């Protein structure tokens, strides 16, 4: 079952080759036998099996939808009525939301079975999934290495064949970077395409939900399910959603690919540079036009991103004061002590670091110098990317400058962790869609290829990624069968 695509799983379930109960139990067994990955924070086994039984009845009557009866995992920052929503933080370790996030409701309406919620960096702040109150997640390809972050649990669950697909969030690369490190496919949609209602906020102008799966074809199937306008999300865009699964099957011709020289810097591992150049050659052999482009503002991407992201995090996380919800300190005799102690005890070191940074850049005397300046630079970055994408279909490059690094290797060096996002943050700053797909290995560790496109060009982006995967087998590699 674990080698089936989503379309194949759906067809097999509809043809009654095996039942949803059998598939769901298979996933539960895989999760239980791979607990050392630490990919999940919570499981809902009994409810998942009940929903699988219901799905089998629907399928028996020939009334199922494409995702009916297929188990999935959800990053633990999407609100769910049944399961706690912890954000991998002591602050919310026992928090149970009174409602379901829109994305959860959509999956339920489409018959998917939420089997559990995955581990992550605390409040989605991190690039290694080592900043979790519930412990680090391990990479299925090498259990001594990180899976990437912040959606590391979701990526590890898919790469380890624990579930067919999973949902994550991407604020500066938190879907694409783990997808690259774990050798799977992941897409960050255009800002506003997928509802953020019920997704706990890190940086509201940057956050976007998106799927992990083995292939671009699978991503198209999931994205069609979750995309669309939501009146509960003021940033949601009201536009017609195409059938992405149908769109990617159309002929892909006259592809214009932008290749930035600034993506091939000395700090990018040579094996990664070679893999990207090989991918570019393959596209060229398939008839694509390769156009060298110059992104002059690329050196400003990371500093601009971290000023804005930390500022928004500081504002968003001010709601956790130990009074209305979240961890409440037991060692406080005054209101100020209650708030101070609750936040000191409830937040981890990386979250505290970003709150302090954000508060600093928003403070009197520094607002104009840092935050306002970063917002101006953000507009320039956005304009440069949009102008560039008027002459090419996609911008190609590595998803990350390195392959997955060892657990603990960079935990005490936040700057090195932040630089893991050097190629991914721009898509968030500009609100553009971007996808990471597997494109080779270096020392038996996966390499990710990133494609970034115009606003709402998901159909084209997925089609190009699918075109690449039709001519390569990298996305079929399995960590359980390596060397």
From Swiss-Prot:
The active site is at 75 (charge relay system), 150 (charge relay system), 174 (acyl-ester intermediate). The keyword Cytoplasm does not apply. It catalyses: L-glutamyl-tRNA(Gln) + L-glutamine + ATP + H2O = L-glutaminyl-tRNA(Gln) + L-glutamate + ADP + phosphate + H(+). SUPFAM superfamilies: Amidase signature (AS) enzymes (SSF75304). GO terms for molecular function: ATP binding; glutaminyl-tRNA synthase (glutamine-hydrolyzing) activity. Its EC number is 6.3.5.7. It holds the Pfam family Amidase. Keywords: ATP-binding, Ligase, Nucleotide-binding, Protein biosynthesis. The keyword Calcium does not apply. Signal peptide: none annotated. InterPro entries: Amidase, Amidase_CS, Amidase_dom, AS_sf, GatA. One of its GO terms (biological process) is translation. One of its GO terms (cellular component) is glutamyl-tRNA(Gln) amidotransferase complex. Allows the formation of correctly charged Gln-tRNA(Gln) through the transamidation of misacylated Glu-tRNA(Gln) in organisms which lack glutaminyl-tRNA synthetase. The reaction takes place in the presence of glutamine and ATP through an activated gamma-phospho-Glu-tRNA(Gln). Belongs to the amidase family. GatA subfamily. PANTHER family: GLUTAMYL-TRNA(GLN) AMIDOTRANSFERASE SUBUNIT A (PTHR11895:SF151), TRANSAMIDASE (PTHR11895). Heterotrimer of A, B and C subunits. This is Glutamyl-tRNA(Gln) amidotransferase subunit A. It comes from Legionella pneumophila (strain Corby). The gene is gatA.
């Amino acid at each position: 079952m674990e080698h089936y695509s989503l379309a194949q799983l759906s067809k097999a379930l509809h043809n009654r080759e095996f039942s949803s109960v059998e598939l769901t139990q298979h996933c539960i067994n895989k999760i239980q036998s791979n607990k050392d990955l630490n990919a999940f924070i919570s499981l809902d086994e009994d409810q998942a099996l009940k929903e699988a039984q219901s799905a089998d009845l629907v399928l028996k009557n020939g009334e199922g939808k494409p995702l009916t009866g297929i188990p999935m995992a959800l990053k633990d920052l999407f609100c769910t009525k049944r399961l706690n929503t912890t954000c991998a933080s002591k602050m919310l370790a026992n928090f149970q939301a009174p409602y379901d996030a829109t994305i959860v409701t959509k999956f339920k309406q489409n018959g998917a079975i939420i089997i559990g919620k995955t581990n992550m960096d605390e409040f989605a702040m991190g690039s290694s999934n080592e900043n979790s109150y519930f412990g680090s997640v391990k990479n299925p390809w090498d259990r001594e290495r990180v899976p990437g972050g912040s959606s590391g649990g979701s990526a590890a669950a898919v790469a380890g064949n624990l579930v067919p697909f999973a949902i994550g969030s991407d604020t500066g690369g938190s879907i694409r970077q783990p997808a690259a490190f774990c050798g799977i496919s992941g897409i960050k949609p255009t800002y506003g395409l997928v509802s953020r209602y019920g997704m706990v906020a890190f940086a509201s102008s940057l956050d976007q939900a998106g799927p992990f799966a083995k292939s671009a074809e699978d991503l198209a199937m999931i994205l069609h399910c979750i995309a669309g306008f939501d009146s509960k999300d003021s940033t949601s865009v009201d536009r017609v959603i195409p059938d992405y699964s149908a769109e990617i099957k159309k002929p892909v011709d006259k592809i214009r690919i932008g290749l930035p020289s600034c993506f091939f810097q000395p700090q990018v591992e040579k094996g990664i540079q070679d893999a990207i150049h090989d991918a570019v050659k393959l596209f060229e052999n398939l008839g694509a036009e390769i156009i060298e482009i110059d992104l002059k503002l690329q050196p400003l991407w990371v500093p601009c991103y971290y000023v804005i992201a930390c500022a928004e995090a500081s504002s968003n996380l001010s709601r956790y004061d130990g009074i209305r919800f979240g961890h409440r300190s037991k060692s406080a005799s005054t209101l100020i002590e209650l708030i101070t102690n609750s936040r000191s005890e409830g937040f981890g070191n990386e979250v505290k670091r970003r709150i302090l940074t954000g508060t600093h850049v928003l403070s009197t005397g520094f607002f104009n110098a840092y935050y306002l300046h970063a917002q101006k630079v953000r507009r320039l970055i956005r304009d440069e990317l949009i102008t560039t994408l008027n002459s090419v279909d996609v911008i190609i490059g590595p998803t990350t400058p390195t392959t997955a690094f060892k657990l603990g290797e960079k935990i005490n060096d936040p700057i090195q962790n932040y630089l893991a996002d050097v190629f991914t943050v721009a898509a968030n700053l500009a609100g553009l869609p971007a996808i990471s797909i597997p494109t080779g290995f270096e020392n038996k560790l996966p390499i990710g290829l990133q494609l970034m496109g115009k606003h709402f060009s998901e159909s084209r982006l997925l089609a190009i990624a699918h075109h690449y995967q039709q001519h390569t087998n990298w996305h079929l590699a399995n960590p359980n069968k390596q060397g």
